Swiss-Prot record:
Residues reported in the UniProt entry to bind ATP: S39, P40, A41, G42, Y43, G44, K45, T46
PANTHER family in UniProt: DNA-BINDING TRANSCRIPTIONAL ACTIVATOR DEVR_DOSR (PTHR44688:SF16)
DNA-binding region positions on the chain: 854-873
Annotated GO MF terms: ATP binding; DNA binding; DNA-binding transcription factor activity
Record function comment: Positively regulates the transcription of the maltose regulon whose gene products are responsible for uptake and catabolism of malto-oligosaccharides. Specifically binds to the promoter region of its target genes, recognizing a short DNA motif called the MalT box.
Keywords: Activator, ATP-binding, Carbohydrate metabolism, DNA-binding, Nucleotide-binding, Transcription, Transcription regulation
CDD domains listed in its UniProt record: LuxR_C_like
GO biological processes: positive regulation of carbohydrate metabolic process; positive regulation of DNA-templated transcription
Entry keyword annotation includes Transcription regulation: yes
Family per record: Belongs to the MalT family.
Subunit structure: Monomer in solution. Oligomerizes to an active state in the presence of the positive effectors ATP and maltotriose.
NCBIfam families named in the record: PRK04841.1
The protein, known as: HTH-type transcriptional regulator MalT
């Protein structure tokens, strides 16, 4: 629950001075991105801005306290304030904030701005006491907020110091409205108005001006002068002389002498006890101070001018002026030290009764009452955990003695889940093992099963599938059906383990069960995870259309539960969509998906972007754009050297490196990589198959055909046994290259036919295209034989078109520079030298060599088909050939002579 008073603008009191000159300046705030009001305590920042805010309906107010340094708490209140200002316009952002289901503050703010793009009227958000924020993550997020907020949005920040919000940049760009302490200081006219409203006897203007000068226009000092004069029946001038030169850091003695010592004992105790509350209402006051009518007492203190201010229009919530509240809390520690723990306990009880467990924990910690803290956690800790109050929970659990945790082992489980959420895997197992060893008596079987479910999740995250499977099975055997969360975790882990082991059908079944349970119990992140896993399994099985449809369901889930869009898991989904699009040669869409994945991870460590970057390299390679691929590989290799990655990630990164070396003939890099790359022990899943395939590709590049063939034959055996049909399709293509390069043309044709047939199921295109000219030559031969079944014939033509489109190095060889070098080559055929082709005829020869039909050549060169026939007839005559295949062979011989590996 959110405390209402933190979202209420302060009530404007009748006796306050209206700061007309400053309000005039603030009236233009809508022309600036940021209005910044800064000064030390007591200069009237909050009062001024509350005057300006009066009458503005589309304005949110957020009063900070020290607890708002928790990112999740900050986000919840900030979004709630904007919801108040917009009348609930940003419902998606509100749901994400309430459920704590966003990747970072910046991603939450990005969603907020999407919703605010449809809000066209001026909008304001006031954040009071920003100096209390010390969390650098919040500072970074607010800098992002200021950079990207809509043009009709103005942020108003009140702070005792200059906040870390990129102020200089805003100032240079004239996007900053500033009001500082010199402007906030009362002038003579305002001081006179102030005293006229506060003192029963008017004072002369000259006297008022002298007092204003004595305290340099400091509003708090003026208030103290008036209070002292009323309480002691002394002249205001005498009080002013005492305050001259005093600042906020030297007020304590003065406040004791002039305020505390001048109220009765009952009021003094009320002030000291109530000061422990960051905000207060009738029920809290009754419990903390023992007063029977808390509301009446608060209103009386307000009337006495004792620095108490209303926090909302209802008048139910109050707080002390920050300067006075800080002073009172310090005095309370000195004067009521013995009573202080009991006062905090009373506050905690009252907060609990009103449904604010996080505030209750704050007071239980301050009371040092481990038993009370334990009881609050037992009743509310899991709710706080599900709302990501992780920092508060960690602080609370650290405050409990180990014996208390052992007596309440579900708190041990909570502490372990906290560690798991922070990727402290080894600590999780150490903690649980210690607890099991030291818990007295027989441990509850259900709790033990929950321990095992968590251990299973840790094991799979840490790359230990065997242990994960054992623990997940134990958990599922012992967990009651009602313990749905742990059952979802254990089922998901078991399914993931079976995926790793290559048992795809059973893994798919378990992931479907996980999805059903997760949807039923609204555990949406596990529902999304299970859909992603299902899609990966279907891809591995070769059912790419089914994988596509599962991905569509996952995208629909994200659309329905929009908070999921902010999770890193969203990147996983768009990444596997990019992989599928790449396989189908939809390269522009694949690249866009990969880049959207990088955008999802923009606030995370760069290492997290490795997989999407790998896909960008793949797209460049499939297009034959080796320069761009090299540039992207430089970044990829830098990331590889600065992180620890799952073997799947390494396999994918190595794949594009080895393909690049193949396309550029870089045998040195391939040999070096092969020497230092460990060979996996198995090949029973897609990422282990992938790394073995990388090894075989490097061996083929180095001419090590025999060991490469052994590897590929074993991979095929495993792939057929485990029904890893997509891997089988890839393996056949690489085996085709091995046979082709080793001169075994019949074997090459046989496995290519198998690969084409299997591609009817997988839909693979780019996997053929990436093999370049060797694949193009074979496909041209198969097409000319005219023996392929209709579907394979159609696919072969499509693949050849893609190769011709993206791998233009064949055509580029017949440009003017190439022709000039060719004609000057000592081995050029005499017929070419004595009867040279025109530049257009060279272009036509290049396109014939690339497999273009006459119609395609005409379209490529934008001329009539009859013109192309004339060019072909002329070049045939000059080359001394009669048939198209003879021209292709002649072009191939010329390319070989010039040193091109065709």
């Amino acid at each position: 629950m959110l405390i209402p008073s933190k979202l209420s603008r302060p009530v404007r009191l009748d006796h306050t001075v209206v700061r007309e000159r400053l309000l005039a300046k603030l009236s233009g705030a809508n022309n600036f991105r940021l209005a910044l009001v800064t000064s030390p305590a007591g200069y009237g920042k909050t009062t001024l801005v509350s005057q300006w805010a009066a009458g503005k309906n589309e304005l949110g107010w957020y009063s900070l306290d020290e607890g708002d340094n928790q990112q999740e708490r900050f986000a919840s209140y900030l979004i709630a304030a904007i919801q108040q200002a917009t009348g609930g316009h940003c419902s998606t952002s509100e749901a994400m904030a309430q459920k704590r289901q966003y990747a970072s503050l910046t991603s939450l703010f990005a969603q907020l701005f999407i919703e605010l793009a449809q809000w066209h009227r001026p909008l304001y958000l006031v954040i009071d006491d920003y100096h209390l924020i010390t969390n650098p993550v919040i500072h970074d997020a607010m800098r992002f907020f200021l950079r990207h907020q809509p043009e009709n949005f103005t942020l108003v920040v009140l702070s005792r110091n200059l906040p870390q919000l990129g102020i200089a940049n805003l100032r240079v760009r004239d996007q900053l409205l500033e009001i500082g302490s010199q402007q906030l200081a009362f002038n003579h006219q305002e001081a006179k108005q102030f005293f006229d409203r506060r003192l029963s006897s008017p004072i002369e203007a000259a006297e008022s001006s002298r007092m204003c000068d004595d305290v340099a226009g400091w509003a708090t000092a003026l208030q103290l002068i008036a209070l002292s004069a009323r309480q002691n029946h002394t002249s205001a001038h005498h009080s002013a002389r005492r305050l001259a030169g005093i600042n906020a850091s030297h007020l304590s003695d003065y406040l004791v002498d002039e305020v505390l010592d001048n109220v009765d004992v009952s009021t003094r105790h009320f002030l000291l006890k109530s000061a422990i509350l960051r905000s207060m209402n009738d029920a809290l006051i009754v419990r903390v101070t023992g007063e029977e009518n808390g509301q009446m007492r608060l209103e009386e203190i307000e009337r006495q001018g004792l620095f108490l201010q209303r926090m909302d229009d209802t008048g139910e919530w109050f707080s002390y002026h920050p300067l006075f509240g800080s002073f009172l809390r310090q005095r309370c520690q000195w004067e009521l030290a013995a009573e202080l723990p009991e006062i905090h306990r009373a506050a905690a009880e009252s907060w609990m009764e009103q449904g604010f467990p996080s505030e209750a924990i704050h007071h239980a910690l301050a009371a040092g009452d481990a038993q009370m803290l334990r009881d609050i956690l037992l009743n509310h800790a899991w709710g706080l955990f599900n709302h990501s109050e992780l920092a508060l929970l960690e602080e609370s659990l650290k405050a409990l003695p180990w014996e208390s945790l052992l007596e309440n082992p579900r708190l041990v489980l909570l502490q372990a889940w906290l560690m798991q959420s922070q990727h402290r895997y080894s600590e999780v197992n150490t903690l649980l093992a210690r607890a099991e060893q030291e818990i007295k008596g027989v441990m509850d079987g259900t709790l033990h099963a929950e321990f095992n479910a968590l251990r299973a999740q840790v094991a799979i995250n840490d790359g230990n599938p065997e242990e994960a499977e054992r623990l997940a099975k134990l958990a599922l055997d012992e967990l009651p059906l009602a313990w749905f969360y742990s059952r979802i975790v254990a089922t998901s882990v078991h399914g993931e383990v079976l995926h790793c082991k290559g048992d795809l059908s059973q893994s798919l079944s378990l992931m479907q069960q996980t999805e059903q349970m997760a949807r039923h119990h609204d555990v949406w992140h596990y529902a999304l995870w299970s859909l992603i896993q299902q899609s990966e399994i279907q891809f591995a099985q070769g059912f790419l259309q089914a994988a596509w449809e599962t991905q569509e369901r996952a995208f629909q889930l994200i659309k329905e539960q929009q908070h999921l869009e902010q999770l890193p898991m969203h990147e996983f989904l768009v990444r596997i969509r990019a992989q599928l699009l790449w396989a189908w040669a939809r390269l522009d869409e694949a690249e866009a998906s990969a880049r959207s994945g990088i955008a999802v991870l923009s606030t995370f460590q760069p290492q997290q972007q490795l997989q999407c970057l790998t896909l960008l390299v793949q797209c460049s390679l499939a297009r034959g754009d080796l320069d761009n691929a090299r540039s992207q590989l430089n970044r990829l290799e830098n990331l590889l050297g600065n992180g620890r990655y799952h073997c799947d990630w390494i396999s994918n990164a190595d794949k594009v490196r080895v393909i690049y070396w193949q396309l550029t003939g870089d045998k040195k890099s391939a040999a070096n990589w092969l020497r230092h790359t460990p060979k996996p022990a198995f090949a029973n899943n897609h990422f282990l198959q992938g790394q073995w395939r990388n090894i075989a590709r490097a061996q083929i590049l180095l001419g090590e055909f025999e060991p490469a063939e052994i590897v590929l034959e074993e991979l095929n055996e495993n792939a057929r046994s485990l029904r890893l049909m997509s891997d089988l399709n890839r393996n056949l293509l690489l085996l085709n290259q091995l046979y082709w390069q080793s001169g075994r043309k019949n074997d090459a044709q046989r496995v290519l036919l198998d690969a084409l047939q299997l591609a009817n199921r997988t839909g693979f295109i780019s996997h053929f295209v990436i093999e370049g000219e060797a694949m193009a030559q074979q496909l041209r031969q198969l097409i000319q034989l005219n023996t392929l079944p209709e579907m394979e014939q159609h696919r072969a033509q499509r693949i050849l078109r893609e190769i011709n489109q993206h791998h233009r190095h064949k055509f580029a060889h017949f440009d003017e520079g190439f022709v000039e070098r060719l004609l000057n080559h000592p081995d050029v055929p005499e017929l070419i030298r004595t009867s040279p082709l025109t530049q257009r005829e060279w272009q036509v020869l290049g396109l014939i060599y690339s497999g273009y039909s006459n119609e395609q050549i005409a379209g490529e060169l934008a001329v009539a088909a009859t013109t192309i026939k004339t060019h072909i007839r002329n070049l045939y005559q000059k080359l001394g050939v009669a048939h198209r295949q003879d021209a292709v062979q002649h072009a191939q011989q010329l390319l070989k002579m010039m040193g091109y590996g065709v």
